[in-house]
Amino acid sequence: MLIWLVELANHVQFFNLFRYITFRTGAAMFTAALIVFLFGPKIIASLKVRQGKGQPIRADGPQTHFKKSGTPTMGGLMILAGIVGSSLLWADLSNVYVVATLLVTLGFGAIGFYDDYLKVTKQSDKGFSGKARLAIEFLIAGIAVFFMMEAAKISAPQGPHLATSIAFPFFKDALLNVGYFFIVFGGFVIVSAGNAVNLTDGLDGLAIVPVMIASAAFGLIAYLAGNAVFSGYLQINFVPGTGELAVILGSVIGAGLGFLWFNAPPAAIFMGDTGSLALGGLIGTVAVATKHEIVMVIIGGLFVMETLSVIIQVFWYKRTKKRVFLMAPIHHHFEKKGWTESQVVIRFWIIAVGLAMLGLATLKLR
């Protein structure tokens, strides 16, 4: 919204700063953190009163988790307030990619909120029906992908070909044109990202820091992909307008820092599905917009690892009635093996940093 003040730059030189994505990204980060810091305590107090017993703890989980009983969930509301409030101020709201990303973020956040509500009111880890939840997620993601695809057809130098193509890292101009099937592919990427982050959110601080790391990496990718000079130099696909997504990702980092203040162990609040689904969907949407869906598998490798551990566990148990892991997702497996919660969390953070650096390295490998 404040980008419109650029029109006054001829009269007030300071407003010229609003032209620059880098300035607005930094401002969005600061604003989002400030929003969470200011309103966080009130939101936590309100949720604690309304929820009573807080988020239900899995009976088959590690024994150390039972002391967390009574901790409120739905902390994602704080994160969403920071992201949306900051983005409305600093991002270009006429940008299709910005609107699509906020649509997915709010849509997935609403699904997560309803899921959290059911879990809290029923005091059960069973929330929203899995099939219904996935169907709504795919609908929201599909709408977002369609509009981003149509925007790319008009603005991208390669036009319709790039808009409906899957890009591959390591190879220059390696594109697989799948036509309108790209809506299905893009929707799958976004939904998978949302649920992968959701599965990772099982320990204090475990999900939010890797989300911030991935956001920083994709913030750089968005800025480069939206810049004709930088994308040309790196030989990555130029998608005009995607640079504006760096502003939203800046707000994610700011909101994440604010949330971590309250989520640091012992957590005063959990983000719940409200936050994890929204954040994962947001990152997935940026990956689709910038044509870095496959690179997301590397940068978000920690989330992929968590998801695969669940898939393997369920598949193998159905076939053999035996478990590959002591408990899934895999962070619980390491807890069962004797790692402390802080050991699991910090070591997983280190993995997330390494994977983000590896993912960014692919930008230069052509």
UniProtKB/Swiss-Prot annotation:
Question: Where can this protein be found?
Answer: Cell inner membrane
Function according to Swiss-Prot or TrEMBL: Catalyzes the initial step of the lipid cycle reactions in the biosynthesis of the cell wall peptidoglycan: transfers peptidoglycan precursor phospho-MurNAc-pentapeptide from UDP-MurNAc-pentapeptide onto the lipid carrier undecaprenyl phosphate, yielding undecaprenyl-pyrophosphoryl-MurNAc-pentapeptide, known as lipid I.
Name of the encoding gene: mraY
Q: How does it sit in the membrane?
A: Multi-pass membrane protein
Name by which UniProt lists this protein: Phospho-N-acetylmuramoyl-pentapeptide-transferase
Q: Which InterPro entries match?
A: Glycosyl_transferase_4, PNAcMuramoyl-5peptid_Trfase, PNAcMuramoyl-5peptid_Trfase_CS
Question: Which GO molecular function, any one, fits this protein according to its record?
Answer: UDP-N-acetylmuramoyl-L-alanyl-D-glutamyl-meso-2,6-diaminopimelyl-D-alanyl-D-alanine:undecaprenyl-phosphate transferase activity
EC number(s) given by UniProt: 2.7.8.13
Enumerate the cofactors the protein uses: Mg(2+)
Superkingdom of the source?
Bacteria
- Which family is annotated? Belongs to the glycosyltransferase 4 family. MraY subfamily.
| One Pfam family matching this protein | Glycos_transf_4
- Residues passing through the membrane, by range: 27-47, 71-91, 93-113, 134-154, 174-194, 205-225, 245-265, 268-288, 294-314, 343-363
Q: Which GO terms describe its biological process?
A: cell division; cell wall organization; peptidoglycan biosynthetic process; regulation of cell shape
Q: Which reaction does it catalyse?
A: UDP-N-acetyl-alpha-D-muramoyl-L-alanyl-gamma-D-glutamyl-meso-2,6-diaminopimeloyl-D-alanyl-D-alanine + di-trans,octa-cis-undecaprenyl phosphate = di-trans,octa-cis-undecaprenyl diphospho-N-acetyl-alpha-D-muramoyl-L-alanyl-D-glutamyl-meso-2,6-diaminopimeloyl-D-alanyl-D-alanine + UMP
Keywords assigned by UniProt?
A: Cell cycle, Cell division, Cell inner membrane, Cell membrane, Cell shape, Cell wall biogenesis/degradation, Magnesium, Membrane, Metal-binding, Peptidoglycan synthesis, Transferase, Transmembrane, Transmembrane helix
Q: Its pathway?
A: Cell wall biogenesis; peptidoglycan biosynthesis
Under the heading NCBIfam families, the entry gives: mraY
Q: Which species expresses this protein natively?
A: Allorhizobium ampelinum (strain ATCC BAA-846 / DSM 112012 / S4) (Agrobacterium vitis (strain S4))
Q: Name one GO cellular component term.
A: plasma membrane
